[in-house]
């Protein structure tokens, strides 16, 4: 019984404390406490607030209000609900506390979800104030309270205590380096901030967000090995070397790398890595841990191109299309050659202009009937369609141009008549994706067309030669599907390491109207290069008439892809550069081209040709002699003037400078050894010839040596004398002293005679 009374007292204390922190009830507290029940039949209690967020003034005001209410209840003759409801009686039962605890858990979950929805931007911060939730008792409990006349207690609610927290949603976890930068390369950490600052201090061209991962000691293989360090970052592979003030910096973007291979130095030592880009090849040797460096380079490379697959032997890569690209092959990836070389898209040279002028002179020697025999457009079907491919091309090898068909004539080639005057016209077509030029050329439309696509391919072939193209093959014009087509093929040299590449061009005349406009589409493909089968370059040429019978030339191009490739960016960049260079050369060629003046030409016989030829030879011969002599003298002066600059340029090469320094050191060493071996004594060099003649009685030592000997002997005699006196032995070393004294007397006598002779001869 005592235990039950103690537990009842504990419950009464808990109820009093709970009633002290209750929030405002729904009608006024005084009215509800006086009546004992709610007028509306339901008693509502609000979720009380956390005392941590309540001000002291509010707590004190609530305490005073509750004390006032208690006094008012006492005056009304009512007892406290806690006194009227001892343990086991009334409406306060243990089941109520259990039900209220479950309901409190549900309320806490609802409150937590609500707080998460309102704090999505910063989920780690706890809401400063919880949203109150209102709960009501059921109608049955209210009916029981009204019937018994007792006041039902509010349900026990769980609230956010001072140590509670709201669960934040899951966040993405990333591994960060020591300097706080999130690493995008999985499994590798960035270098510390000091090394990163030193890295950007050396390579100032790199963006600051390109962080250093690691660096390794190695040597760049060139004419000599340049020892330095390789720096690996997220987007670049860099190398720095400083030898005797010669600084070498290399920055290789990872996006331009074609292959990464393991190599051996001197075919024996497996400590080198070869990195090949679109335009260059770099060999780094002398790695202490070659495999570790190689794996990191491959990881960075794959991080930039996630769909790359390294082959099993570690040589070359394979792209998503399955094409294997080997870094050791001689294929060219130079987009300059794959995009900028078209069948009608090369520049000219002075040699081409000279040969064109010679062709015009030969045309002037034809008959008048041949002058008027020009057709507008040759619509004849090509001959020899069943012949081999070699019979339908014009081959240029070296300086010779050969037509491969047997009869020596190419009647299927296209040509248009020369129109010298025409009003302006407008090109109604649309350009391709990238416009290269829209300029006016000081030539007629017919002239420009004949130079590019005419039957006489001398100009275009010479132009190809000026661009250093080889194995030029220009096919015949063939009419296919009412459109003229021509095949062009040549080999273009490119930058190392690939040396050259083959280009295949198809020229198609889409619209041919000399009185309106001409439209030519040239399609270039380079299947031999990596990803060469995945794209073609199309170039559109539009010729229309401008003012003063000139030509309005519109050139545009586009790169069309049939497959996806990881070299798309570099290839399109190279295509843009190659096309821009080509257009510049082409416009220069048209400006340098000169049309021979047309006029009434006389019929020239064979006798007239021979006579004119002989006169021209006799008149030009002296000029050639004079010009040759002038050229020789001018060339000699030019060489003499440029010789110092040539030497300086030659010495600027590190290898040459090192050889010169080593040779100079060898010469200096040889001279120094000669000076040591054949050195002359000071007194000997000062002697005159006359004194040598007078020295008939030669003394076996010079003056300086004699003085040194005298001094040493006197010291020795002095020491011996002291020793003799101290030891009282007069016979000790007596013989040696006597010999020295005799020699000194003879020496003194000879010196006196020599002095006398010099005085007699007048030297003293």
Swiss-Prot record:
Q: Which InterPro entries match?
A: Cholesterol_transport (IPR051482), GRAM (IPR004182), PH-like_dom_sf (IPR011993), VASt (IPR031968)
| Listed Acidic residues bias regions | 98-113, 352-371
Q: Where is the GRAM domain?
A: 197-264
Does the keyword Glycoprotein feature in the UniProt annotation?
yes
- The reply to whether Repeat figures as a keyword in the UniProt entry is no
The subcellular location is: Membrane
Question: How does this protein lie in the membrane?
Answer: Single-pass membrane protein
Query: Locations of Low complexity compositional bias?
Result: 321-330
Q: Which residues carry a glycan?
A: 23, 118, 240, 330, 364, 376, 442, 554, 627
The membrane-spanning stretches of this chain are 647-667
Q: GO MF annotations for this entry?
A: lipid binding; sterol binding; sterol transfer activity
Any GO BP: intracellular sterol transport
What spans does the record annotate as topological domain Lumenal, numbered to this chain? 1-646
Q: Where is this region: Disordered?
A: 22-173, 320-406, 598-626
Lineage top rank: taxon = Eukaryota
Keyword line: Glycoprotein, Membrane, Phosphoprotein, Transmembrane, Transmembrane helix
* Name of the protein this chain belongs to: Uncharacterized membrane protein C20F10.07
Its source organism is Schizosaccharomyces pombe (strain 972 / ATCC 24843)
